[in-house]
Amino acid sequence: MNKRVQYLIEGITKDITIYLMDDEGYELPEALSIFHNSETFAKLSDEDTGLYIESSAYVYEILKGELKYGKIQ
C-alpha cells in the first residue's frame, strides 16, 4: 500500500475512533475494535474504493449506518 494512502487511512481511523469515544462513550480499545472489525474499515482499507480520500465525517456516517443496520447501506 502506498505510504500516502496509509497515512490518510490512519488519520481517518484516528478521527473515527475519537468520534466513537465522544458520541457513543466507548473506551479506546472498544472503539478501535468496533471500527477495525467493520465493513466500513474494510472498504476504507481497499484502495480501489477510493474511500480514503473522503472526509472522516463522511466515513463516520457510513459506519453509523452500518452499525445501525448491520451492513453498509
Regions found by a protein language model. Name each.
Residues 1-73:
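C-terminal alpha-helical interaction appendages
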